[in-house]
Amino acid sequence: EFCRVEPSYTRKLKAMLLFLAGNIPYEVNISKLASYLEISKNTVLSYLDSMKRAELLHLLYADNKTVTKMQKPDKIFIHNPNMLYALANQCQIGTVRECFVVNQLSARHTVEYGKSVGDFKIDGSVTLEVGGEKKTFDQIADIPNSYILADNLEYPVGKKLPLWIVGLNY
């Protein structure tokens, strides 16, 4: 009873995981999720916490310093991008990129959801925007200590870094 889940609710957990995989990155609406699963909001939050502890999900908050246990996350990602391909019918490449970044950087860093600027804030000081090789600095132009992590890039070009480089962090 690691997660304190009634055996009859395991189908709800599976349905929740499949729903989230198909809608990742999911900007959280606990009421809609609870309604979809036909469970209470507190149960949804409890299940999210259990799936986080089981390393099935990454729960991101815009400000990690003020997070409480029963607070809804700002964004949810599947823990490992490979799981996306196993659980979702189709995967958006942008979603896979972001899942990869969160998965790799969260092993050694605090990753926050960049709610207003950039995709992520790392250790409270570095702003990251994730995209393809044509990604521009428009969204993070005036932000100090900001970088783009770009797919299909072989080597760094200024503050534009290849996406694969975060894999060396693990």
Give, region by region, the residue ranges found by the protein language model:
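Short, well-ordered alpha-helix to beta-strand connector turns
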Residues: 109, 124, 143-145
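Domain-level recognition of nuclease-like catalytic cores that cleave nucleotide substrates
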Residues: 154-170
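Conserved catalytic cores of phosphodiester-cleaving nucleases, focusing on short active-site segments
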Residues: 105, 120-139
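A broadly conserved detector of short glycine/acidic/proline-rich loop/turn motifs that flank catalytic sites
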Residues: 63, 82-83, 117, 126, ...
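Active-site-adjacent loop/helix micro-motif of nuclease/hydrolase catalytic cores
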Residues: 88, 93, 133-142, 157-158
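Short hydrophobic-aromatic micro-motifs
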Residues: 53, 77-78, 127-129, 148
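Accessory nucleic acid-recognition modules appended to NTPase machines
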Residues: 1-115
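Nucleic-acid nuclease catalytic cores
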Residues: 145-156
